[in-house]
Amino acid sequence: VITIALLVLLIWITWIRRQYAFGGGGIMEQVHRVVLSHLDYDGEGKILEVGCGSGALTIRSALTWPKAKVIGVDYWGAVYNYSKALCEKNAASEGVASRCVFQHGDAKQLDFPDESFDVVISNYVYHNVMGADMQKLLLESLRVLKKGGVFALNDDMKPKMYGDMEGFAQKLRDMGYQDVRLIDTAQEAFGSHRRAAMMMLGSSRLLVGRK
């Protein structure tokens, strides 16, 4: 029985990794399309992806907006076997290497001045930053967004980690941010909360708006 359970667990983990894989036609490609579809963006200027992993969303952004320069930052820990070299290889394979830059970075303290980017995006990153205040991470990402710039920050926003996100969205509105919304990406991107939960992303929500 234990052997069967371990085999099932291995198959499940393998399936999840395939969904996250670059260019694998998995669920994450659909998630990326949903995230980018909520950006009211003219395609000019610079995009920052916080936590770029394999570079998939960075590259998708470059393909979607041919005039944009896209910067992907990541801590690249050992858990997922991603690296700067892998991101650069993936960007080259899609023909966008000249417009994609990848560099080491920390979501808790981004190495960019205030108001550096026209767009800031992120996808399932913040909940992996151990011991961090999730709302502070969001504010740090928004710090580097230009006035008038747009953002789309997607994560598994469990209340025990994120706290009151409706209250946070209102806080942003009170600070002058416009068109701030929380979108249920478990439903929109995965088709159902059950399917999202199979990937341990049942509380997926996308925070979007304009600074």
Each predicted region: which residue ranges?
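Class I SAM-dependent methyltransferase Rossmann-like catalytic core
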Residues: 10-34
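Class I SAM-dependent methyltransferase SAM/SAH-binding core
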Residues: 48, 58, 63-108
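Conserved SAM/SAH-binding loop
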Residues: 54
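Helix-to-beta-strand junctions that scaffold the AdoMet/dcAdoMet cofactor pocket
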Residues: 65, 129-131, 145-147
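A short acidic, Gly/Pro-enriched loop at the edge of an enzyme's catalytic core
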Residues: 108-120
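A short glycine-rich, Lys/Arg-flanked "PGG" loop and its adjoining helix->strand segment in the class I
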Residues: 135-147
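Conserved beta-strand signature within the Rossmann-like core of class I S-adenosyl-L-methionine
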Residues: 148-155
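Core SAM-dependent methyltransferase catalytic element
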Residues: 176, 189-211
